[in-house]
Amino acid sequence: FPNFFRRLTAEGAFTVAFVPTFSRLLQDKGKKDALEFAEEVISIMGIGLFLFSFFVIIFMPTFMLGLAPGFIEQDWLFDLTVELARITFIYLTPISLVALLGGILNSFGKFGAMASAPILLNIILIVSLVFFENSMETKGPVLAIAVAISGVAQFIWLLEACRQHGSIRKLR
C-alpha cells in the first residue's frame, strides 16, 4: 500500500516533473533561484505528505476494508494488516523526499549519496532481524519498523549530502 503512493510521489509524475524544472532553473536562473525553488518544493511536499500520511494512518482500517476485504473475516489477520500498514506508511514521506533530494544532487552530477542510500534499508533490515531474532514470534512488526526507520535514515543521509554540497541551506 505505501509503495503505491511512493511510486506516485517518489518515482512518479512529481519527481519526473521536478528534476527537469529544477535543472532548467539551475541552467537559466542560477543555483540560488533553483535551490530556493527546491527548498520550497521540499517543504510543501514534506508537509503535504506528512498530513496525508497522518490521515491514512488514522483511517487505515477503512482503507484496508477496501484493499483487503477478505481479511475482515479473520480478526487477527485484519488487525495485523492494519498494524503493519500503519507502521510502513511512515516510510512514504521520507522516501519521497529522498527522491527529490537525490534529483537535486544528480542535477549537480553528484550520484554517490543517492546511489548508496538503499544500502541503509538493507543494513537496517538485516540488523533488526539479527538483533530481534529471538524476541518476537513473527518478524513482520520488526521488519515494518525497520522499513520506517530506514526511510528516515535515508532522508537524513541525503539531506546531509545536500547540505555538505551546499544544495540545501534550509527547509522553508
Each language-model region and where it sits:
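Membrane-embedded alpha-helical bundles of multi-pass transporters/translocases
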Residues: 1-172
